[in-house]
UniProtKB/Swiss-Prot annotation:
This is Small ribosomal subunit protein uS7c. GO terms for molecular function: rRNA binding; structural constituent of ribosome. One of the primary rRNA binding proteins, it binds directly to 16S rRNA where it nucleates assembly of the head domain of the 30S subunit. It is found in: Plastid, Chloroplast. PANTHER family: RIBOSOMAL PROTEIN S7 (PTHR11205). InterPro entries: Ribosomal_uS7, Ribosomal_uS7_bac/org-type, Ribosomal_uS7_CS, Ribosomal_uS7_dom, Ribosomal_uS7_dom_sf. Keywords: Chloroplast, Plastid, Ribonucleoprotein, Ribosomal protein, RNA-binding, rRNA-binding. GO terms for cellular component: chloroplast; small ribosomal subunit. GO terms for biological process: translation. Part of the 30S ribosomal subunit. Belongs to the universal ribosomal protein uS7 family. It comes from Butomus umbellatus (Flowering rush).
Length: 155
């Protein structure tokens, strides 16, 4: 057994303009090739576009979108006796938010449009309204978990 001390849990930092942890999580997921300033530009442009489209607080739209896409349950492949079962498992809040952000960014990357800021803002507004690809992905995951409910005891 290791004699080292346990590592302290890191708290999520918040972004410089909005002082919001969700925005920072979004920036870190959109980041490519270490270009963080570009990631910040994309996010802030998307937030401005949301402000123009909805004429409400863009951070509340972001929170609502992430809350709408966050899954409560997911399936995990588990090998039992030579066959692989999709076992439904509950998801914690942090992991759920991370999944929601990943799905939102994936859906916005697939969208047709001019640039990433435009696509991301459109996806966030749609998700806040309860439509869009990311919401569909969440519903699909929940259906999969419900269909494989019989394997819940394999946890």
């Amino acid at each position: 057994m290791s004699r080292r001390g346990t590592a302290e849990e890191k708290t999520a930092k918040s972004d410089p303009i909005y002082r919001n942890r969700l925005v920072n999580m979004l920036v870190n997921r959109i980041l490519k090739h270490g270009k963080k300033s570009l990631a910040y530009q994309i996010i802030y442009r998307a937030v401005k576009k949301i402000q123009q489209k909805t004429e409400t607080n863009p951070l509340s739209v972001l929170r609502q979108a992430i809350r709408g896409v966050t899954p409560d349950i997911a399936v995990k492949a588990r090998r039992v006796g030579g066959s692989t079962h999709q076992v439904p498992i509950e998801i914690g809040s942090t992991q759920g938010k991370a999944l929601a952000i990943r799905w939102l960014l994936g859906a916005s990357r697939k969208r047709p449009g001019r640039n990433m800021a435009f696509k991301l803002s459109s996806e966030l507004v749609d998700a806040a309204k309860g439509s869009g690809d990311a919401i569909r992905k969440k519903e699909e995951t929940h259906k999969m978990a419900e269909a494989n409910r019989a394997f819940a005891h394999f946890r």
